[in-house]
Amino acid sequence: MRCLPVFVILLLLIASAPSVDARPKTKDDIPLVSFQDHAKRILQTFESRYDCCKTFECCHWG
């Protein structure tokens, strides 16, 4: 029970600390969202090609 007040104080200090990036942004930084969108697009392309090849209508990989 003696640890509980210390734990609460530490949580309050962590929550109130300012958010600072570990490294400054450069002009080449790309947001993570664009990587996720790109990955989704690639997966959708493979899925559409797989569906097409299941029916043997237009099986082309290129």
UniProtKB/Swiss-Prot annotation:
Where it mainly occurs, coarsely classed, is secreted
Task: Cite the GO molecular-function annotations of the record.
Answer: toxin activity
Q: How is it modified after translation?
A: Contains 2 disulfide bonds that can be either 'C1-C3, C2-C4' or 'C1-C4, C2-C3', since these disulfide connectivities have been observed for conotoxins with cysteine framework V (for examples, see AC P0DQQ7 and AC P81755).
Record key words, sorted:
Amidation, Cleavage on pair of basic residues, Disulfide bond, Secreted, Signal, Toxin
Q: Which GO terms describe its cellular component?
A: extracellular region
On tissue specificity, the annotation reads: Expressed by the venom duct.
**Subcellular location(s) per record:** Secreted
Q: Does the keyword Nucleotidyltransferase apply?
A: no
Alphabetical list of InterPro entries matching this protein: T-conotoxin
Keyword Secreted annotated: yes
Region forming the signal peptide: 1-22
> Propeptide residues, per UniProt?
23-48
What residues bear Tryptophan amide in this entry?
W61
Q: Which domain of life is it from?
A: Eukaryota
* Entry note about domains: The cysteine framework is V (CC-CC).
In which family does this protein belong, per the annotation?
Belongs to the conotoxin T superfamily.
- According to UniProt, the name of this protein is Conotoxin Pn-014
